[in-house]
Amino acid sequence: MFVEQPKRFEDPHFPDHVMRLKKALYGLKQAPRVWYDRLTHYLLNRGFKRGYADRTLFVKNDKTYLLIAQVYVDDIVFGATIDDRAIEFSKEMKKEFEMSMVEELTFFLVLQVKQKKEGIFVSQEKYARNIVKKFGLNSKKHASTPISSSTKLNVDSSGVEVSPTLYRSIIGSLLYLTTSRPDIAFSIGVHARYQAAPKESHLIAVKRIIRYINGTPDYGLWYSKDSNACLAGYSNEDWACSVDDRKSTSGGCFYLGNNLVSWMSKKQNSVSFSTAEAE
């Protein structure tokens, strides 16, 4: 690879020459892709299959065991149904790549993981408490629900304007929390609709979510070890519930046995003329 000479550091004798790159000070933009291709090639050659929906998920399904590896840039989380296979995988990876181990997973990308004999509990308790503290609501009264059932938000054209930066910062922080908190997915989706021109009424309402979190920071997802593998899906909608344009909002979730594995809350793109049409 060749690069141009840095400005003001050109060689006076060869100003038009280029330099051959020995090592990039802060890495190259191609590095992540090269690393991913290198790791993918290694895993596929050893019997792993890459996920279709998640291209960073690799699964090795043998007759006697199951080994799963989840890749996030240069961090790899893996586990197996047989402990010896996980240990063997770790040793093989160390031979091929320079890497370090942190033993049992307890914290990953702000996710706190508690592993017990009965199952695994995933939460974002530390992150939730930081949100409450960040926006100065740790001393405020807790809210029993994330959104009011008696008052519906609207554009509020005549309302008092508030800082869009502050409002968007709250929405962004809360959206990241939905990774382990499906109970606030709908309410955040509703409040996120008013980021373009937030009013005081919107800010008061979105702070209610934070006050709700302040009372429930330790909520999370429990994945039972003894649950069956039956997949079940549920969905519903609130027909024409948006005051501004009468569009409906769809909600859905999927359970693998007793364990919640996927959920969504999304405003529909068009107006439905009946409940049946919305569904």
Show where each model-derived region lies.
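Polymerase palm active-site segment centered on the conserved acidic dipeptide of motif C
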Residues: R50-A53, V77-S123, K133, S224
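Divalent metal-binding acidic/histidine catalytic loops
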Residues: Y26, A31, W35, L57-N61, ...
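Metal/cofactor- and membrane transport-associated sequence elements
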Residues: M1-E98
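Mixed-charge, polar/low-complexity N-terminal
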Residues: Q5-P6, D11-P12, Y52, E88, ...
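Amphipathic alpha-helical interface elements that mediate macromolecular binding in regulatory proteins
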Residues: M1, D16-M19, D37, H41, ...
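A generic structural signal for short, solvent-exposed coil/turn residues
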Residues: H13, K49-G51, K91, L105, ...
